[in-house]
Amino acid sequence: MSATTPGLVCAHHHLYSALARGMPPPPEVATDFQGILEQIWWRLDTALDLEMIRWSAKLGALEALEQGTTAIVDHHESPGAIEGSLDAIADACAEVGVRVVCAYGVTDRHGAD
């Protein structure tokens, strides 16, 4: 006998985090959450361009699908590549066959604009 289950839903993902693997270690060891943000995640998200966003979304979606996840809510930030970033994520996920809802993180850490 076999059973089929519906696809899983990941309600909080950062698809660009697929690019964190292989990053050089931070210059200092983070000892708290703020330090982790500053030393790892904010270094990564400020370096993103549209091509990196597209490929990281595709990789993240493929890895999710491989584990049975068919729908993702992606929380994205790329202060250097805002225009078109959510479309790049949506297109990459569609190519893989994963449903996605994209949300752009709003912050003032790069200034009021």
What does each model-found stretch correspond to?
Residues 47-113:
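Active-site loop-helix segments enriched in His/Asp/Glu that coordinate
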Residues 15, 20-22, 82:
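Short, function-defining helix-loop hinge/capping sites that tune catalysis or transport
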Residues 1-6:
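Histidine-rich, glycine-flanked metal-binding segment
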Residues 19-53, 109-113:
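Active-site gating loops and adjacent loop-to-helix segments of metal-dependent hydrolytic enzymes
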Residues 7-18, 76:
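Histidine-centered catalytic micro-motifs
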Residues 9, 24, 70:
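Gly/Ser/Thr-rich beta-alpha loop segments that engage phosphate groups in nucleotides
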Residues 9-13, 42-43, 67:
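Single, functionally critical "micro-switch" positions that shape active/binding sites
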